[in-house]
Amino acid sequence: MIQPQTYLNVADNSGARELMCIRIIGASNRRYAHIGDVIVAVIKEAIPNSPLERSEVIRAVIVRTCKELKRNNGTIIRYDDNAAVVIDQEGNPKGTRVFGAIPRELRQLNFTKIVSLAPEVL
């Protein structure tokens, strides 16, 4: 469960290292974001000489959360960190690589480009 002021790791090579959620895209009063939700975030830490800079406001899709993800077949998936992938306005990832495992629920949410870049889909 991601809420405003939550820090997230970046799971791609876009140039950002750490994000802070400032808004959840969707209904005007959504309190929490889960896997597959799009958020507005600010870059808190970035790699030097990268196209993304610190304090830049960007969009990102959440790919891992510490809170459990319950599937219809009864399995539960939990990750060790909160992580997101930086995307543009059309929903395409800004990076060319994605690090770590990605849940298969992203494919049903039309983030197929992120799923195809991922090394492992759970």
Curated annotation (Swiss-Prot):
GO terms for biological process: translation. It holds the Pfam family Ribosomal_L14. Gene3D superfamilies: Ribosomal protein L14. Its main location: plastid. It is found in: Plastid, Chloroplast. One of its GO terms (molecular function) is structural constituent of ribosome. Keywords: Chloroplast, Plastid, Ribonucleoprotein, Ribosomal protein, RNA-binding, rRNA-binding. It comes from the Eukaryota. Binds to 23S rRNA. Belongs to the universal ribosomal protein uL14 family. PANTHER family: 50S/60S RIBOSOMAL PROTEIN L14/L23, LARGE RIBOSOMAL SUBUNIT PROTEIN UL14M. Part of the 50S ribosomal subunit. This is Large ribosomal subunit protein uL14c. It comes from Arabis hirsuta (Hairy rock-cress). The gene is rpl14.
